[in-house]
């Protein structure tokens, strides 16, 4: 409602009679307080007496409201934030919720109560949609937040060194800028449901109590905010995956390649599952039976020993196969195991966090048992393990092209540790143990932060290395199916042209058909001097800048630890060199692209 509308809602009030004015002038503070309450109550019933309601006569107290923000790579943070917001609204609290990609960072200065749920990507970095706020809070123009109360829930994976680092960074910076915690930060691991539910329950109880103390009547928000969509995937989800059939498993790297990359095709017929280019497919898997046997043999545990898992009793061999994480080590496992395996060397490892992190990254769980033998019961061992979690793979097909199928591009994890061959959990399941027509449990994980432009006439630049090319196959398939006018440019890198050119014939056909307008390939090991995608970006600086001036959207997919950082540095060099901006101006330009959703990353 405009100011003009507010002024004309009711007829003007007549002036008070002189005798009333004289009487009021003699009231003390206590009498004024009583009279204001009496008048307000009467005003609430004024309309029934034919009197105008005093809608603007008294200043309204500030409503008790909470802002709930989420920053997510795959959607988990958003789902938790939405649940927290729903809980608060059910308690009668006014809630404003948003994903950080849709939130104006400068608005943070005006917030009074804030809940933030954030994941972490790469080497402890915030998700791409949180970068603008992260930079603001850590920059020279960071606002004072002394009027803000906040709580942070971090989502992460404790097998990585910088566990929940983005949540830790936001939590610390809020406090440094003067904000006060509503609750201590919670760092939730892959199996985050219990931690997230407890955090949501605690914050809802606390804020409900605070709202009751507040004189303003909470105004529940009953209409979902704009942009909030119902998941299109029907009843199949992470908790209830669809039992799909494997259609194809084809190795697409050459026999001589050091990489084993598979093109996987899965049948979704009958599932009513829908996905968009940029989405991921969640894959549930069983651990390798040989790995389960090796672990039980090392511990001296009878495979038939009954334990409780998944809410029911079952043999420990079955539990380890289907319910517990065996291929990703964690600091928590090593510390817990050290309490049973009394070795001075192991004690030294857990005493130094940097050494522990390096040990975890390079030593599988089974090889911890080999190196430091110990005797544990089945119950003692499983208490050290995390629940098994699905793996997410970027979808490499467009449903407009393949219908009820979904395609994946899977890099199979294979390595040796102290002479023993090891294989990744999900990638080994898909490549080695899942037979054609065999069943694999899947679900669609939306990724709204990695989407083609709504305007299909806009040009796109796709930058990826290795299996990071997967979503770009889906992008170009989609544009070809739509006969889109927008130009497509692929910048792709891998070690060798002859061994590692993923989907070579398809890219050639797309180019021939007019749907791949420009392409640059970086083969890092085909010459003495290594060439990477970032080198191609710098080499094509003028052309890339021209595409940006034409409104191009840039997409980056691949390794977060090295490749994504090097690509961003190269993009900044392009903006500085071809765009004639200084370093600060280039950073601001890249931030502008982020805010306009013209610079999107899917890194892991």
UniProtKB/Swiss-Prot annotation:
| The protein's Enzyme Commission number | 1.8.1.2
* Biological role: Component of the sulfite reductase complex that catalyzes the 6-electron reduction of sulfite to sulfide. This is one of several activities required for the biosynthesis of L-cysteine from sulfate. The flavoprotein component catalyzes the electron flow from NADPH -> FAD -> FMN to the hemoprotein component.
Q: Where does FAD bind?
A: 327, 361, 391-394, 409-411, 424-427, 604
Q: How does it assemble?
A: Alpha(8)-beta(8). The alpha component is a flavoprotein, the beta component is a hemoprotein.
Give the protein's cofactors.
FAD; FMN
Reaction(s) this enzyme catalyzes, per UniProt: hydrogen sulfide + 3 NADP(+) + 3 H2O = sulfite + 3 NADPH + 4 H(+)
The protein here is known as Sulfite reductase [NADPH] flavoprotein alpha-component
């Amino acid at each position: 409602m405009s100011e003009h509308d507010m002024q004309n809602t009711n007829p003007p009030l007549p002036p008070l009679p002189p005798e009333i004015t004289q009487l009021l002038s003699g009231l003390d503070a206590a009498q004024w307080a009583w009279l204001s309450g009496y008048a307000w109550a009467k005003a609430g019933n004024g309309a029934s007496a034919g009197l105008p309601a005093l809608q603007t006569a008294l200043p309204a107290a500030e409503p008790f409201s909470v802002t709930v923000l989420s920053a997510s790579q795959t959607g988990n943070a958003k789902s938790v934030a939405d649940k927290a917001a729903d809980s608060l609204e059910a308690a009668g609290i006014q809630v404003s919720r948003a994903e950080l990609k849709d939130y104006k960072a400068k608005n943070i200065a005006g917030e009074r109560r804030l809940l933030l749920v954030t994941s972490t990507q790469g080497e402890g970095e915030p998700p791409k949609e949180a970068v603008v706020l992260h930079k603001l809070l850590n920059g020279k123009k960071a606002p004072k937040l002394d009027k803000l109360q906040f709580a942070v829930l971090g989502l992460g994976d404790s097998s990585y060194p910088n566990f929940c680092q983005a949540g830790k960074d936001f939590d610390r910076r809020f406090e440094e800028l003067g904000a006060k915690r509503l609750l201590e930060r919670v760092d939730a691991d892959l199996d985050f449901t219990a931690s997230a539910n407890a955090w949501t329950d605690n914050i809802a109880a606390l804020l409900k109590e605070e709202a009751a103390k507040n004189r303003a009547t909470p105004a529940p928000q009953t209409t979902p905010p704009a942009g909030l969509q119902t998941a299109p995937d029907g009843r199949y989800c992470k908790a209830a995956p669809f039992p799909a059939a494997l259609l194809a498993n084809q190795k697409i790297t050459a026999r001589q390649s050091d990489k084993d990359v598979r093109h996987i095709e899965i049948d979704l017929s009958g599932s009513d599952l829908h996905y968009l280019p940029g989405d991921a497919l969640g894959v549930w898997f069983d651990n390798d039976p040989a790995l389960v046997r090796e672990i039980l043999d090392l511990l001296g545990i009878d495979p038939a020993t009954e334990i409780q898992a998944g809410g029911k009793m079952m043999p420990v061999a079955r539990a380890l196969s289907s319910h517990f994480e065996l291929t990703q080590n964690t600091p928590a496992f090593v510390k817990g195991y050290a309490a049973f395996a009394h070795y001075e060397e192991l004690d030294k490892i857990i005493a130094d966090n940097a050494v522990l992190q390096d040990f975890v990254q390079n030593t599988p769980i089974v090889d911890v048992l080999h190196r430091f033998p110990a005797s544990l019961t089945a119950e003692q061992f499983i208490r050290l393990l995390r629940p098994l979690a699905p793996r997410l793979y970027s979808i490499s097909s467009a449903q407009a092209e393949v219908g009820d199928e979904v395609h994946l591009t899977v890099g199979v994890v294979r390595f040796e540790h102290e002479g023993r061959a090891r294989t990744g959990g999900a990638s080994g399941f898909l490549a080695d143990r899942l037979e054609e027509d065999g069943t694999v449990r899947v679900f669609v994980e939306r990724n709204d932060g990695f989407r083609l432009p709504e305007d299909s006439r806009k040009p796109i630049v796709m930058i990826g290395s290795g299996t990071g090319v997967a979503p770009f196959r889906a992008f170009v398939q989609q544009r070809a199916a739509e006969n889109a006018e927008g130009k497509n440019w692929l910048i792709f890198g891998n070690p060798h042209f002859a061994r590692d050119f993923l989907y070579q014939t398809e890219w050639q056909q797309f180019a021939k058909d007019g749907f791949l307008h420009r392409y640059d390939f970086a083969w890092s090991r085909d010459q003495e001097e290594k060439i990477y995608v970032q080198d191609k970006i710098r080499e094509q600086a003028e052309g890339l800048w021209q595409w940006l001036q034409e409104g191009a959207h840039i997409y980056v997919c691949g390794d977060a630890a090295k490749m994504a950082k090097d690509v961003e540095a190269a993009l900044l060099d392009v903006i500085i060199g071809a765009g004639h901006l200084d370093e600060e101006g280039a950073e601001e330009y890249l931030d502008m692209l982020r805010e306009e959703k013209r610079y999107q990353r899917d890194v892991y």
